[in-house]
């Protein structure tokens, strides 16, 4: 489905597999994506289908059900249900479980290369372990941060009291996927100007006039901005490199 899971599938399959991503344009809003007839047809020839699950548009579920493809649903590998936070690739547990599920699916579909898939799985987990070690070294209380959209899990932490007191309206509107009121926006801008927020995390795929106001206020207040996305940006070739780069960006933002 989305390209970050396609990159994991490629890493785990090596030269033995051919991976086709359904969503290839990184500027497309994944929540609103509607599959074309060509997209559905691709599932008909697949032996393994990897989809995100949770609230992210269930394109893969709909298209893969009539086929014989083994379906790997990333969210479900960690017990995340439909309606939960869909940005599951930020979770180490989901990444690890999904990788193992993909490997098992490959070994079932192509048993003659079972050992190859086991070796690639081991190599992938070694890289994932390096990423988790990097995150562990960074994960500590770095001060208040407010997110523009609910993308969590990479560097989790509590939301400090100053954040709740000064920007609760905006944060609540974002959590409910509704638009903040003018008063909420002003409160947030004032919070940024007052120096209560040390870092602003922004979903670049949901940019609009409201976020422009907030990011503008953050820049004016010299608050570091870290951009996240719901699909892996073009400059990265695999999910783990993208996650590692984000950790570097967070580290630079809080120096």
Predicted regions and their residues:
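Extracytoplasmic metal-acquisition and chelation regions
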Residues: 1-255
